[in-house]
């Protein structure tokens, strides 16, 4: 959208509504056609959404003297989630009560409690006015097209914000575990479970439960690569392992039930939804008229802070859920979603519950899970079509043609949408292959690997999963008696799990790890797929950029500890936009900044000379056991991006043969196919040997058997391709 056009009142909202209305019917049909398979991403995102909300509710219950509990946070998440899934613009966006909202409500409660003419009794009524002002400010921002500025956020800001959220989650987990060793407030310290010995026992048992959930949860996500168990069992554990582990460790907490006091381990504390104290907030609108006029006007101050906070969090969460790398085919709706958020904020304030907004990392996690689902459906269809064609002695051109036909059969053409990335594959690439008329030998033509190379990453864009997960959160309100049986330490373990799970794939985190890696071991980075900047940016420059980003991160994290003002830490993230645009170019070369702050997550392949596997063996080693595992390898987990990886099949001479590619022309075919998905691949030239990397004549014993050329420019066997040396070991 043009910036001048975006500031025309209502222009952005009208464009968003028009674009999404054309897709609305298909949003529901697409989800329903997925059948029971939609339950896997639904359950996955439900637990990622519900467990933090329950924990935040318990935190609010302590900080507001019971005025707000887990019942209210669950109701807010469910209500806003259902409304957004039905009439929202971007259905991939997940709404929920977030940590900044908890901090802000704690501040407002302490302020109200300290004022005799307001007091804790009018706290919810005053927050109703705060939410009313917040909603009006969000309306104003949406009408004026303020969301246009979100597009200026680069990887620098996004990854720093992702690490900051991970730090806040880990901080909450550590704080919760430490509290397990103390006596909670508003309890009888003379009770048996609060005696020093039992308090220590509660803390140690809680440490076991939280660590157990963290360890088993991380392991279960990699179940598809296990060597043991049937494929369906490994897939089930990978999809549902974390919620299953919550149940398992909850059951373990009941083992010593005869030998310990009843309160060990400690469990969630929240009233049932039918308890007298749980529904007093629903009539808070009647008490709003009792708030003094002065405090109604003063409510603009916290409302402005919350509006800025929601504008940033909601828009960035939506941006991360619909990145370009996800290849979404339907238009965004930033302005309309912000406008709808204003309505939801007012609604929540009028019924006395904390408002919900777009949350990170749940939103990109939702998109990633739907990409995995769509990938499984497409992959199975294309593999079946290819095998059927091969059994009929088809040529390679006919095989690819049948796969494209199968692909198009699964697509649902829409009006006003981006075209599919695979459209025209047969005409643009297959007919250019020199051996397109050659018969296919299934013993050397790896169908599944070929499908993985040509199948673009696409997301099953629909509203069903968001609607179902919101309804499941609503079901948690009625299931509160069961939820209260979960040990609080298990939830702290889940917080730590979400923090750690968000780190891999974050280039900022990878550079931090690289800084602490011994210089003699840094070459190990090149033995696996790695970010392209490792080869293009000098190590000294990389270190300076990382140290700047780390210092900025610590400043942002320190601000979160400042009373009241701590909630405005997103302003520091927003300040990175002018810093990146006007300040950093004075200290770093433009080419280096481009690689370190790239819009896409691009990786270079591992270097074959680091191991002695034949090319065919390495090619097969890079394939995955099943479709779900493929997406585990392709996705980063911090921002949910797609890793752009140069195919190993690009190497090798034009006269040789590779696994998955018929001799000679197959290499050229795959070069064109991969180039089609990522045009930048053809512009990258990678180092060939360990001696190149080290910049000297020293060669690893593992590289003595020969070197495989990796330059896509020499993929056809020609020489003369430019060779670029790695800069990882260089200081300038």
UniProtKB/Swiss-Prot annotation:
Topological domains, Extracellular: 59-77, 145-157, 219-234, 313-339, 485-556
GO biological processes: monoatomic anion transport
Cytoplasmic topological segments: 1-37, 99-123, 179-197, 256-291, 361-463, 578-732
GO terms under cellular component: plasma membrane
Principal location class: membrane
Transmembrane segments: 38-58, 78-98, 124-144, 158-178, 198-218, 235-255, 292-312, 340-360, 464-484, 557-577
Database matches in Pfam families: HCO3_cotransp
InterPro entries in the cross-refs: HCO3_transpt-like_TM_dom (IPR011531), HCO3_transpt_euk (IPR003020)
UniProt KW Acetylation keyword: yes
UniProtKB keywords: Acetylation, Anion exchange, Ion transport, Membrane, Transmembrane, Transmembrane helix, Transport
Annotated GO MF terms: solute:inorganic anion antiporter activity
Its job: Probable boron transporter. Boron is essential for maintaining the integrity of plants cell walls.
Protein's name according to its UniProt entry: Probable boron transporter 3
Organism: Arabidopsis thaliana
Organism phylogeny: Eukaryota, Viridiplantae, Streptophyta, Embryophyta, Tracheophyta
């Amino acid at each position: 959208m043009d910036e001048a056009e975006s500031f025309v009142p209502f222009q952005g909202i009208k464009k968003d509504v028009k674009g999404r209305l054309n897709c609305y019917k298909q949003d529901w049909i697409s989800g329903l056609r997925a059948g029971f398979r939609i339950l896997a991403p639904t359950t996955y995102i439900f637990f990622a959404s519900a467990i933090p909300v329950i924990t935040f509710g318990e935190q609010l219950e302590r900080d507001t003297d019971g005025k707000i509990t887990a019942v209210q946070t669950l109701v807010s998440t469910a209500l806003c989630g259902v409304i957004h899934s039905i009439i929202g613009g971007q259905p991939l966006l997940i709404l929920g009560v977030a940590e900044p909202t908890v901090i802000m409500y704690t501040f407002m409660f302490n302020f109200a409690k300290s004022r005799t003419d307001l007091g804790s009794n009018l706290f919810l009524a005053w927050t109703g006015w705060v939410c009313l002002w917040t909603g009006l400010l969000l309306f104003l921002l949406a009408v004026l097209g303020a969301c246009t500025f979100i597009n200026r956020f680069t990887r620098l800001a996004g990854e720093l914000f992702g690490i900051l959220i991970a730090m806040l989650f880990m901080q909450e987990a550590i704080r919760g575990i430490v509290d397990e060793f103390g006596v909670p407030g508003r309890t009888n310290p003379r009770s048996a479970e609060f005696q020093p010995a039992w308090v220590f026992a509660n803390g140690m048992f809680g440490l076991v439960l939280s660590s157990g959930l963290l360890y088993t949860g991380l392991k279960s996500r990699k179940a598809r690569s296990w060597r043991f168990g049937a494929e369906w069992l490994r897939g089930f554990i990978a999809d549902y392992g974390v919620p299953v582990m919550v149940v398992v460790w909850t059951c373990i907490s009941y083992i010593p039930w005869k030998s310990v006091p009843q309160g060990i381990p400690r469990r969630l504390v929240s009233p049932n939804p039918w308890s007298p104290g749980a529904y007093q907030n629903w009539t808070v609108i009647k008490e709003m008229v009792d708030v003094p006029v002065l405090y109604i006007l003063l409510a603009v101050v916290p409302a402005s802070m919350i509006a800025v906070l929601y504008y940033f969090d909601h828009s960035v969460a939506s941006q991360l859920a619909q990145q370009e790398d996800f290849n979404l085919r339907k238009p965004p709706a930033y302005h309309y979603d912000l406008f709808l958020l204003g309505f939801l904020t007012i609604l929540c304030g009028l019924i006395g519950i904390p408002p919900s907004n777009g949350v990170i990392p749940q939103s990109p996690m939702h998109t990633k899970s739907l990409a995995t689902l769509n990938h499984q459906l497409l992959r199975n269809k294309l593999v079946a079509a290819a095998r059927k064609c091969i059994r009929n002695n088809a040529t390679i051109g006919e095989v690819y043609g049948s796969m494209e036909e199968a692909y198009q059969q699964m697509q649902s053409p829409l009006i006003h949408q981006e075209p599919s990335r695979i459209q025209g594959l047969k005409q643009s690439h297959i007919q250019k292959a020199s051996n397109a008329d050659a018969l296919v030998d299934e013993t050397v033509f790896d169908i599944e690997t070929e499908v993985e190379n040509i199948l673009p990453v696409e997301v099953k864009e629909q509203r069903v999963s968001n609607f179902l997960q919101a309804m499941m959160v609503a079901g948690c309100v009625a299931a509160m008696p069961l939820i209260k049986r979960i040990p609080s330490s298990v939830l702290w373990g889940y917080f730590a799990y979400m923090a750690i799970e968000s780190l891999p794939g974050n280039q900022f985190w990878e550079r931090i790890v690289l800084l602490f890696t011994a210089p003699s071991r840094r070459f190990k980075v090149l033995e696996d797929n790695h970010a392209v900047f490792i080869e293009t940016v000098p190590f000294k420059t990389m270190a300076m950029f990382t140290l700047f980003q780390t210092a900025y991160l610590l400043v942002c994290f320190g601000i979160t500890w400042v009373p009241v003002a701590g909630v405005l830490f997103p302003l520091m993230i927003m300040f990175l936009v002018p810093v990146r645009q006007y300040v950093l170019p004075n200290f770093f070369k433009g080419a280096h900044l481009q690689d370190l702050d790239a819009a896409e997550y691009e990786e270079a392949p591992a270097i074959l000379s680091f191991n002695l596997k034949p090319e065919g063996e390495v090619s097969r080693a890079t394939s995955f056991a099943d479709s779900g595992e493929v997406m585990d390898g392709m996705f980063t987990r911090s921002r949910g991006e797609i890793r752009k990886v140069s195919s190993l099949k690009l190497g090798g001479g034009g006269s040789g043969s590779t696994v998955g590619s018929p001799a000679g022309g197959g290499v050229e075919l795959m070069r064109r196919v991969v180039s089609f998905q990522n045009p930048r691949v053809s512009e990258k030239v990678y180092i060939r040997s360990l001696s190149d990397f080290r910049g000297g004549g020293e060669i690893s014993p593992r590289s003595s058997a020969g070197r495989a050329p990796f330059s896509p420019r020499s993929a056809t066997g020609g020489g003369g391709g430019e060779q670029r040396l790695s800069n990882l070991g260089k200081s300038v």
